[in-house]
């Protein structure tokens, strides 16, 4: 599998000069990272020249707080579980506040991505029995915009709508870019890391009005039940090795 991945990455490097290519071993997963300006042209070439006739999935990613944890010790502690529900980390804040990039335990983000928002597409070539992950970062995190791929793979239509709905990523050229999972009057994008876990509004039935009403959240305390933990131990040796291989491949 390693030889097959190496041969494939050589072809990608020859065709897409300047792009970053990473290989995760031993599974042989290949990731092609391109600039947002080259997103559409690269995907078109992958379909027409390299035989990736199917896009099986597309999603958005929010890297806010990436690399930060909320529980950075493996030793027995007298502080107890309270450390998991105190402090200002990503997800632990109320509406109108901005999450801290630092954990309550003092851990710092590591290997931060270039930009906050990314779009990731999973491609399949049946004729070459090959899979490929393609990623690009939106250059503007205030209004993240990348080109739509609906004219290349029509089936990506609803995937892009989902990424727009949940992350607020705008797909330029999409024929019908509107929400697909949340209400049309929904405020914000719920998969963004700065979206409060308590939400913006809560729903209840009003006896006087005889209908459902939306009101600002007042009955929910902003807290995280399970803290984010990043551990380096034997269970993650393979993953750590893959990261090393990927960095070498770049």
UniProtKB/Swiss-Prot annotation:
Tell me which UniProt keywords the record has, alphabetically.
Cell inner membrane, Cell membrane, Membrane, NAD, Quinone, Translocase, Transport, Ubiquinone
Task: Tell me yes or no: is Nucleotide-binding among this UniProt entry's keywords.
Answer: no
Q: Is ATP-binding tagged as a keyword?
A: no
Q: Give the reaction(s) catalysed.
A: a quinone + NADH + 5 H(+)(in) = a quinol + NAD(+) + 4 H(+)(out)
Query: Chief location of this protein?
Result: membrane
Places the protein is found:
Cell inner membrane
Q: Which GO terms describe its cellular component?
A: plasma membrane
EC numbers, comma separated: 7.1.1.-
Q: List, in alphabetical order, the Gene Ontology terms for molecular function in this entry.
A: NADH dehydrogenase (ubiquinone) activity; NADH:ubiquinone reductase (non-electrogenic) activity; quinone binding
Membrane topology category: Peripheral membrane protein
Pfam annotation, one family: Complex1_30kDa
Which Gene3D superfamilies does the protein's record reference?
NADH:ubiquinone oxidoreductase, 30kDa subunit (3.30.460.80)
* Role: NDH-1 shuttles electrons from NADH, via FMN and iron-sulfur (Fe-S) centers, to quinones in the respiratory chain. The immediate electron acceptor for the enzyme in this species is believed to be ubiquinone. Couples the redox reaction to proton translocation (for every two electrons transferred, four hydrogen ions are translocated across the cytoplasmic membrane), and thus conserves the redox energy in a proton gradient.
Oligomeric form and interacting partners: NDH-1 is composed of 14 different subunits. Subunits NuoB, C, D, E, F, and G constitute the peripheral sector of the complex.
Under the heading PANTHER family, the entry gives: NADH DEHYDROGENASE [UBIQUINONE] IRON-SULFUR PROTEIN 3, MITOCHONDRIAL (PTHR10884:SF14), NADH DEHYDROGENASE UBIQUINONE IRON-SULFUR PROTEIN 3 (PTHR10884)
Task: Report the family membership.
Answer: Belongs to the complex I 30 kDa subunit family.
This one is known as NADH-quinone oxidoreductase subunit C
Organism this protein belongs to: Xanthomonas euvesicatoria pv. vesicatoria (strain 85-10)
């Amino acid at each position: 599998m390693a030889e097959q991945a190496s041969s494939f990455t050589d072809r990608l490097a020859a065709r897409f000069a300047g792009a970053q290519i990473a290989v995760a071993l031993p599974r042989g997963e290949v990731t092609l990272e391109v600039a947002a300006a080259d997103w559409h042209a690269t995907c078109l070439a992958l379909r027409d020249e390299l035989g990736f006739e199917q896009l099986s999935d597309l999603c958005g990613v929010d890297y806010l707080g990436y690399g930060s944890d909320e529980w950075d010790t493996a030793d027995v502690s007298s502080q107890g579980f309270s450390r998991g529900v105190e402090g200002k980390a990503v997800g632990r804040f109320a509406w109108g506040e901005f999450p801290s990039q630092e954990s309550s335990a003092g851990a710092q983000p590591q290997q931060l991505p270039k930009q906050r928002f990314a779009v990731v597409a999973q491609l399949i070539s049946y004729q070459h029995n090959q899979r490929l992950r393609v990623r690009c970062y939106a250059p503007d995190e205030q209004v993240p915009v990348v080109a739509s791929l609906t004219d290349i793979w029509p089936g990506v239509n609803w995937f892009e709508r989902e990424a727009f709905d949940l992350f607020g990523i705008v797909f330029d050229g999409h024929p019908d870019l509107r929400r697909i999972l949340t209400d049309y009057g929904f405020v914000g994008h719920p998969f963004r890391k700065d979206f409060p876990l308590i939400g913006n509004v809560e729903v209840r039935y009003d006896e006087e009005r005889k209908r459902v009403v939306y009101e600002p959240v007042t009955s929910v305390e902003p807290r995280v039940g399970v803290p984010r933990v990043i551990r380096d131990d034997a269970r993650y040796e393979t993953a750590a090795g893959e990261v090393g291989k990927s960095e070498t491949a770049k």
